[in-house]
């Protein structure tokens, strides 16, 4: 370890360094600087009157490996009187401030001109290096730093970079890095940095979590059209001004919304961002507008629009959705529910408005604003009011993923009949919500043929509706079980051009 303090042969002393001229210590005399001398035979040892202050945790670790003698730190006056005195060593003048960013100065306390001390130091260093395995050191390379021929101390902090070997310089660098304040890499970016990052993003699917927190993101969205409006908000067709990807932007009014409910929406939407399924509408991200008390949710754009809009548009034109198309829609919804079931999620809001189709005819589930329940523990919360709720939910009983199967059955029954399955349109329009919910608990669902309109439904289709609308949830199959129903199995074998179907629905 002594080699860490040995100057290299090629090192030149800095001529600007102060030249130390200290009085020689002879004949057991005490100088004016209170240097105490303890005699033991012919040997003399110098001690500084100033007791070094304790090392800090950083400096003690650094210099614990650089002492020339293992017992220097524990020496006392009593023990020194009982052993030959070693050559004098430089004392450490240490700054006691624990937050100091520079190393303490190393200053020799005496300049000993006696050649015996130089020889003793060389012999001591050689012996220690033999013990440590450093046998490549030669006496010529270990000139005493205390020789009178070099009055400029090589251990002054100002000359450290010029006179100390590379190993010690590495220690200095490591120490200074560990002592410097840690710069956190997770510091929030400034608004200008976020602006630059957002400019580098061309499409909505490339925005990361920080991009969605950008304050002026709303100003960078271009609205291409309105897809739907309601009392609670609206859905628009949008794209980023510097992008090309079309997406749907849903705006929800949160003026009178419970803050806890808003937090629930945030958590669930963030969780739903990880969903990757061809039967689930992709969720891109969300941001808030406190001035307008609104939440903006960006989702995959589905150009075929909702099942609700499709079947009502066909009714206006005197048409209906065929059983083959309904089979493909029911299969896709069941596969989407099965995927959510694997993710421990209950949708809880299956209805015609939340079943969407794109231009290619793909069917996907959307709107997870009130979804996100663990399936293993049955949910006991009653969220929202919907005419598509399963009986167990209306009664406030525990419910599971089979409640989504009920909602699917009621949805398919409505689309097939061209109206909500109530006794009459007049009753459905004027009935109070509570009475309608009580009617759902007691009615017997039935898919009826319409011979006058040349509409005849297959028995397997009617059986599928009956299984979905079992009032006892214990008798109602799960989505995965319903995929194996004979009607679904039979519809899988049929070729249906869903893309052509969507084009015909919206053909002018």
Swiss-Prot record:
Bias (Low complexity): 48-66
An example Gene Ontology molecular-function term: MAP kinase kinase activity
Active site: 349 (proton acceptor)
PANTHER family: DUAL SPECIFICITY MITOGEN-ACTIVATED PROTEIN KINASE KINASE 5-RELATED, MAP KINASE KINASE MKK1_SSP32-RELATED
Protein name: MAP kinase kinase MKK1/SSP32
Catalytic activity reported: L-seryl-[protein] + ATP = O-phospho-L-seryl-[protein] + ADP + H(+); L-threonyl-[protein] + ATP = O-phospho-L-threonyl-[protein] + ADP + H(+); L-tyrosyl-[protein] + ATP = O-phospho-L-tyrosyl-[protein] + ADP + H(+)
Keywords per UniProt: ATP-binding, Kinase, Nucleotide-binding, Phosphoprotein, Serine/threonine-protein kinase, Transferase
Cited function: Involved in a signal transduction pathway that play a role in yeast cell morphogenesis and cell growth. This pathway seems to start by SMP3; then involve the kinase PKC1 that may act on the BCK1 kinase that then phosphorylates MKK1 and MKK2 which themselves phosphorylate the MPK1 kinase.
Residue ranges annotated for the Protein kinase domain, each copy included: 221-488
E.C. numbers: 2.7.12.2
Keyword Kinase: yes
Keyword rRNA processing attached: no
Disordered, as annotated region: 1-21, 35-95, 130-158
Note in the entry: Present with 1040 molecules/cell in log phase SD medium.
One Gene Ontology term from the biological process aspect of the record: pexophagy
């Amino acid at each position: 370890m002594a080699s860490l303090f040995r100057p290299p042969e090629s090192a030149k002393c800095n001529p600007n360094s102060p030249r130390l001229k200290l009085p020689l210590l002879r004949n057991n005399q005490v100088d004016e600087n209170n240097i105490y001398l303890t005699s033991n035979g012919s040997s003399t040892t110098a001690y500084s009157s100033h007791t070094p202050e304790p090392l800090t945790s950083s400096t003690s670790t650094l210099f614990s490996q650089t002492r020339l003698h293992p017992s220097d730190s524990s020496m006392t006056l009593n023990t020194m009187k009982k052993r030959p005195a070693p050559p004098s060593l430089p004392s450490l003048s240490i700054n006691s401030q624990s937050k100091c960013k520079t190393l303490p100065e190393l200053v020799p306390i005496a300049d000993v001109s006696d050649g015996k001390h130089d020889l003793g130091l060389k012999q001591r260093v050689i012996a220690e290096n033999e013990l440590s395995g450093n046998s490549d050191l030669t006496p010529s390379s270990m000139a005493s730093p205390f020789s009178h021929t070099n009055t400029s101390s090589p251990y002054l902090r100002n000359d450290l970079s010029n006179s100390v070997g590379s190993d010690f310089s590495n220690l200095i660098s490591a120490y200074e890095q560990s002592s410097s304040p840690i710069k956190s890499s997770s510091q929030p970016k400034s608004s200008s940095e976020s602006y630059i990052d957002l400019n580098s993003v061309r499409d909505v699917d490339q925005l990361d979590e920080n991009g969605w927190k950008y304050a002026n993101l709303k100003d960078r969205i271009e609205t291409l059209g309105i897809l739907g409006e309601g009392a609670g908000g609206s859905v628009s067709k949008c794209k980023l001004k510097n992008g090309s990807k079309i997406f749907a932007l849903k705006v929800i009014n949160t003026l009178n919304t419970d803050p806890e409910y808003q937090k629930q929406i945030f958590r669930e939407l963030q969780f739903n961002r990880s969903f990757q399924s061809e039967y689930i509408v992709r969720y891109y991200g969300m941001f808030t507008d406190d001035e307008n008390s609104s939440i903006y949710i960006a989702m995959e754009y589905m150009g075929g629009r909702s099942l609700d809009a499709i079947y009502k548009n066909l009714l206006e034109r005197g048409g209906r959705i065929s059983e083959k198309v309904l089979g493909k829609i029911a299969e896709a919804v069941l596969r989407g529910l099965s995927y959510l079931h694997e993710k421990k999620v209950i949708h809880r809001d299956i209805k015609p408005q939340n079943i969407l189709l794109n231009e290619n005819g793909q069917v996907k589930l959307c709107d997870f604003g009130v979804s996100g329940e663990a399936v293993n523990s049955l949910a006991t919360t009653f969220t929202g009011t919907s005419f598509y709720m399963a009986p167990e939910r209306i009664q406030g009983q525990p419910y599971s993923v089979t409640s989504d199967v009920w909602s699917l059955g009621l949805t398919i029954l409505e689309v097939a009949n061209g109206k909500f399955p109530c006794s009459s349109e007049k009753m459905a329009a004027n009935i109070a919500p509570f009475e309608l919910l009580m009617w759902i608990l007691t009615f017997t669902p039935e898919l009826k043929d319409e011979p006058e309109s040349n509409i005849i439904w297959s028995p397997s289709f009617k059986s599928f509706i009956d299984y979905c609308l079992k009032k006892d949830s214990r008798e109602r199959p799960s989505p995965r079980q319903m995929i194996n129903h004979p009607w679904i199995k039979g519809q899988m074998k049929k070729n249906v051009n869903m893309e052509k179907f969507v084009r015909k629905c919206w053909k002018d």
